[in-house]
A protein has these predicted regions:
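Composition-driven recognition of glycine/serine/threonine/acidic- and proline-rich low-complexity segments
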Residues: 2-200
Length: 200
């Protein structure tokens, strides 16, 4: 896909960073193909730089229920950033059905199997995303074990957003639609680099 055509609402100075994260997310999603047992591709992608304080409103407000997969990014000595994938609950359930080859609508809640499936999504996407960033930036990066959370957006995002506000009032949001030939799901990636990761 032509990411330059998909990048919107980004200042020219941010194009390289947005393109880097966009390609990384594309790589991460296509990594799900091995889990699904069939090709998973990105259908559309919209990359934006947004104010951190506005992030909960992107998901329906602080009290809206979300499911998030959180991965911390480790580099040379300290944590180099964070990756958070956010879904509406019904979308996350649909992703579980897609990956487990179940009829759409089979999953209606997060039990051990569903939580484990989404955790594996975090493992695969985190690894593929960081492999791309490592190859591109020359930094050795590795993901933490993923954490899967289902709660109100404000509760889930508060601790993560506090980390961002320590050094920036803006961050990157990547809205994606992806899936197989017969099913599609949508999700939002938050790419939260600290200055050392942005510097490459």
């Amino acid at each position: 896909m032509d990411l330059e055509k998909e990048i919107q609402e980004i200042d020219f100075a941010d194009i390289n960073m947005a393109g880097l994260f966009g390609e990384g997310v594309n790589n991460a999603i296509e990594g799900l193909s091995q889990m699904a047992g069939r090709e998973v591709k990105v259908v559309s992608m919209d990359i934006k730089k947004v104010l951190v304080k506005d992030i909960p409103d992107l998901f329906g407000g602080p009290e809206a229920l979300i499911i998030a997969i959180y991965v911390e990014i480790f580099g040379k000595a300290n944590a180099n950033g964070h990756m958070v994938v956010v879904y509406k609950p019904e979308v996350a359930f649909g992703l579980v059905d897609l990956l487990l080859d179940q009829q759409n609508g089979s999953t209606t809640e997060l039990n051990d199997m569903e939580n484990s499936t989404l955790g594996e999504v975090g493992n695969i996407m985190g690894s593929f995303f960081l492999n791309y960033l490592s190859d591109t930036t020359g930094q050795r990066l590795k993901p933490s074990p993923p954490a899967v959370m289902m709660d109100m957006a404000g509760a889930v995002l508060d601790s993560t957003l506090a980390n961002i506000l320590a050094y920036s009032d803006e961050t990157y949001i990547v809205d994606t639609v992806f899936g197989t030939k017969d099913r599609q799901v949508s999700g939002t990636f938050m790419i939260i680099p600290n200055p050392s990761l942005e510097a490459g």
